């Protein structure tokens, strides 16, 4: 649990930096596309911190429902949203106008990802216990058991499927569309153009 507390304290520190960055940039950048990803990261991190702060203040274990919620938040962030967040923040650097802001965002994202992965590893047994993860059992090689009494069938010759001759192939013709049902377009005569039409088009 000591390692868990260290990870939570580090995550709280990163969350404070995220909040400062949010407060500093929300008026100027709130319409930018990367800001939506930043806001998602802020909310996700805030929800995880809220789960753990209640546990630490009351010195209790998390309930199963809270473990499931933590698993859902970590899984969504790590395996679905993280790549999109990275590309959005990297786009800020690529624009060249706010390079320091982009570098700060990518650094925060890297730190948050490392802490999320650490939380995932530490709490893996709890996730398995709650049924969020399936424990990977070592696979044993399945030995094929052949019962001598049971009939396995007859051996099929490989040439059975190749007995089709060219004469047996049937060529089907494509039916032609009926011309009676189709409407015929009437040809219009071109109007005689005058000299003025030739000039003005």
Curated annotation (Swiss-Prot):
Membrane topology category: Single-pass membrane protein
Keyword terms of this UniProt record: Cytoplasm, Membrane, Nucleus, rRNA processing, Transmembrane, Transmembrane helix
Localisation per UniProt entry: Membrane; Cytoplasm; Nucleus
Name the record gives this protein: Ribonuclease MRP protein subunit RMP1
BP term (GO), one: maturation of 5.8S rRNA
GO molecular function: rRNA primary transcript binding
Regions crossing the membrane: 86-108
Subunit and interaction comment: Component of RNase MRP complex which consists of an RNA moiety and at least 10 protein subunits including POP1, POP3, POP4, POP5, POP6, POP7, POP8, RMP1, RPP1 and SNM1, many of which are shared with the RNase P complex.
Function as written in the Swiss-Prot or TrEMBL entry: Functions as part of ribonuclease MRP (RNase MRP), which is involved in rRNA processing in mitochondria.
Note from the entry: Present with 556 molecules/cell in log phase SD medium.
Nucleus keyword on record: yes
One GO CC term, this protein: nucleolus
